[in-house]
Amino acid sequence: MEFPEGFNQLELLETHGHMIPVGTESAWDEEEDEDEEDDDEEQQSEEWYQQQELKRKDNPLELMLWAAEKNRLSTVERLAASDPSLVNCRDADGYTPLHRASYSGHALVVSFLLDSGADLHARTVDGWTPLHSASRWGHAAIASCLLRRGSEVNAVTNGQLTPLQLAAGNPAALQTLELLLSQRTLQAGLRNSAGETAYDIALRKTAHYGLFEIAEPCNNVY
């Protein structure tokens, strides 16, 4: 399959992964390896984490991003105290510490970063906000926190993906889907660049499509 210049295969994988021919090169082909690494890290000792921090001690930006992703709250607090601008630093893909803490599900780190001035509406190079990250990985508590702070529930990525569409495609994101569907300002019928709504995605990829009755005005009781 040939893609036009600048086409983002990650966006296609979120919506039409079943349509990509076997053998098509993926922009996320190391995901399984990364998952295995994450499992290994969860079993590491405190000494291991301290060694990892030592390796990054001369690069505060890298250390901040790493610490936010790995739930190292004390390290995040220390770095923010020494240089407040680090709460909005970015990696090469535009992910901020808030993005990383959001997709990793670290509520205390998320709250601290927001209290310290982290940009709630920061976008990656693909147009993802922290709410997109939390929704994609099914972290309902994080999504709830971001929404309470003012995150835009209908924000769209460069591929026109909404947080609802991302949650709709994840079988493990039931609570996140329920949360998003309960938002009064939600526009559940928005379509992505492939022309699909969140309901279409849920119908194809999960068993949660029945939840979309929540978003029908006639079923809402105020």
Write out the residue ranges for each language-model feature:
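Leucine-rich solenoid repeat scaffolds
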Residues: 181, 188-216
